[in-house]
Amino acid sequence: MKYKDLREFLTLLEGQGELVRIKQEIDPYLEMAEISDRTLRKGGPAILFEKPKGYRMPVLCNLFGTPKRVALGMGQEDTHALRELGKLLAFLKEPEPPKGFKELIGQLPQWKQVLNMPSKVLGKADCQQVVLSGDEVDLYKLPIMHCHEGDVAPLVTWGLTVTQGPYKKRQNLGIYRQQLIGKNKLIMRWLSHRGGALDFHEWKEANPDKPFPVSVAIGADPATILAAVTPIPDTLSEYAFAGLLRGQKTEVTKSISNDLEIPASAEIVLEGYIDPNETALEGPYGDHTGYYNEQEYFPVFTVTHITMRRDAIYHSTYTGRPPDEPAVLGEALNEVFIPILQKQFPEIVDFYLPPEGCSYRLAVVTIKKQYAGHAKRVMMGVWSFLRQFMYTKFVIVCDDDVNARDWKDVIWAITTRCDPIRDTTLIDHTPIDYLDFASPIAGLGSKMGIDATNKWPGETSREWGTPIKKDPNVVKLVDEIWDQLGL
């Protein structure tokens, strides 16, 4: 499935009953977030608020509020198909030369998809049908949502921030929340390890007194949006991966005020710069953890131009205690991670990030155990192999007879196969999410690995218990007579 832009995707969703238009007047202050939250928790549709109170621009929420819609946005029918995308990413992350002609032929579909990677630059784009500059720039005219009563100000949530470091040809797309503090001012909250922050850091070192160019696209096509949240290799651009998802080159255009490329079909684009010497106190905001975060200083994004499509749609979301939209995205993208991990660690059978673990703070891994100490090797691998898991606090490793996605199974394995002293690994002074106030120091905390596997010789001196298994012949017999038993 290919979607030229966000509007084509919305048409498809509406045709499948996956989008509802709200014609009543709804306030972006708290009301939209409350409606979106209730809808998401019952697995409901995407919502287009056609009459935001005090604004003329409609607001789109809950777009990726179910795993099915995430899969549809990636051009797939269901989340199971996302594993194929993971296999492609694993191939692109560490491509190996084919061992023979037969293997070369087998790799042709993957290399064919690679042809869609280069972007197509347009001279004229829909995202620039309306251009505002100078005094015309007024962010207060956008229906930016205020999601929680304790939030300090409205918050831009689904902006795709485009940046480029001074030494890189590749441009980075990242999603960072942005606090509204003035008609042309936003606070750019990006963590130090994220692509945009790394580009900015390099820029400050190379050009300490020059403004850092930034463009932010709101309401891009679904493939481009989802490419920005997918664990792609560092050498691959988000635009290139969006082309792979779409099966068609990503159309971009040059920003009006800088050289950054923006999605040509985006609904709204904010252009401007960050002064390396200007920061502001950000927050507090209710976050995906279910708590309000601490205040901290971050760079200020000054908006010099706003461009948009005619009759533009403002795309937004809210975050809060799981489940929320980031948790749903994490649940769906979980399928993408598995083949990437399996390429490096073939012994991994399944990998699961429970949504209630705030998308990434706890991981359950099942393996085909092969030797003593194997579980600890896998723990270390999860923490170090992909940057996405550097903030994962807890890794639980189980045998392949345990269902990683069934808490009853996992808890049974922990309570019967784990000794608290022998089978827990604690590591101090590791990178931790700044939003994790449970850590003793902001950005620095500990990790715990739990080995809930059966123990091998060398790991225990005791005779190990044998799991009870049912006789398959008896199970089959009872299955055949079950309906006759009246039970």
UniProtKB/Swiss-Prot annotation:
Q: How is the cofactor bound?
A: Binds 1 prenylated FMN per subunit.
Pathway(s) served = Cofactor biosynthesis; ubiquinone biosynthesis
Family of the protein in this entry? Belongs to the UbiD family.
Q: Which residues bind Mn(2+)?
A: 172, 238
| Needed co-factor(s) | prenylated FMN; Mn(2+)
The chemistry this enzyme catalyses reads: a 4-hydroxy-3-(all-trans-polyprenyl)benzoate + H(+) = a 2-(all-trans-polyprenyl)phenol + CO2
Positions with a binding annotation for prenylated FMN: 175-177, 189-191, 194-195
| PANTHER family xrefs | 3-OCTAPRENYL-4-HYDROXYBENZOATE CARBOXY-LYASE-RELATED, FERULIC ACID DECARBOXYLASE 1
Write the record's keywords in alphabetical order, separated by commas.
Answer: Cell membrane, Decarboxylase, Flavoprotein, FMN, Lyase, Manganese, Membrane, Metal-binding, Ubiquinone biosynthesis
Topology of this chain in the membrane? Peripheral membrane protein
EC main class here is lyase
Residues in a coiled coil are none
Indicate where this protein resides in the cell: Cell membrane
Name of the molecule in the record: 3-octaprenyl-4-hydroxybenzoate carboxy-lyase
Q: Which InterPro entries match?
A: UbiD, UbiD-like_C, UbiD-like_N, UbiD_bacteria, UbiD_Rift_dom
Which NCBIfam families does the record cross-reference, listed alphabetically?
A: PRK10922.1, UbiD family decarboxylase
Question: What SUPFAM superfamilies does UniProt report for this protein, alphabetically?
Answer: FMN-binding split barrel, UbiD C-terminal domain-like
Name the gene.
ubiD
Which residues does UniProt mark as catalytic?
287 (proton donor)
Q: What is the lineage of its organism?
A: Bacteria, Pseudomonadati, Pseudomonadota, Gammaproteobacteria, Pasteurellales
Role played = Catalyzes the decarboxylation of 3-octaprenyl-4-hydroxy benzoate to 2-octaprenylphenol, an intermediate step in ubiquinone biosynthesis.
Q: Which domain of life is it from?
A: Bacteria
Q: Name one GO biological process term.
A: ubiquinone biosynthetic process
Query: Which interval of the chain is the signal sequence?
Result: none
Could you give a GO molecular-function term held by this entry? 3-octaprenyl-4-hydroxybenzoate carboxy-lyase activity
- Cellular-component GO terms for this entry: cytosol; plasma membrane
